[in-house]
């Protein structure tokens, strides 16, 4: 599945940017509290709403660090299932689609295991100094990722007009399995 990912956070950055759907701007949310940096480019899909009330997240594997707001053509290869603050916060995993160095990476099995280990380690630990816990539930392949994307596109079409807290409250009642305390 090929998608255009809007970059929120460049690879190797310790600045957590956040897209604001209401203002359509990318704002600085915080500086990471520790010495960790994002191991890969971190972006989102404007057309897809995840159960945390934000746009669906995508990690884009590439040699380059892309600036916030840039759209990057990417091939989605899988996903990491994650719970953050009790809310489902899926991360699609993708590679840049316009770099010949990545043309041999076409499905989840092609992703180097070390990349997956880096991603898991980062997200399990990047909030430690905030005393917040993140739980990684595992990785899934490109078929699962495509279904998750399609579900999140439907959520955006139906509920994208709601404020984040209104959406999460509604979904906690309708889809409680997506929220784990």
UniProtKB/Swiss-Prot annotation:
The keyword Secreted does not apply. GO terms for cellular component: cytoplasm. Pfam families: Pyrophosphatase. Coiled coil: none annotated. Mg(2+) 2 binds at residue 57. Its main location: cytoplasm. Keywords: Cytoplasm, Hydrolase, Magnesium, Metal-binding. It catalyses: diphosphate + H2O = 2 phosphate + H(+). It is found in: Cytoplasm. GO terms for biological process: phosphate-containing compound metabolic process. It comes from the Bacteria. Its EC number is 3.6.1.1. Mg(2+) 1 binds at residues 52, 57, 89. One of its GO terms (molecular function) is magnesium ion binding. It is an enzyme of class 3 (hydrolase). CDD domains: pyrophosphatase. The keyword Manganese does not apply. Its cofactor is Mg(2+). Substrate binds at residues 16, 30, 42, 126. Catalyzes the hydrolysis of inorganic pyrophosphate (PPi) forming two phosphate ions. Homohexamer. Belongs to the PPase family. This is Inorganic pyrophosphatase. It comes from Ureaplasma parvum serovar 3 (strain ATCC 700970). The gene is ppa.
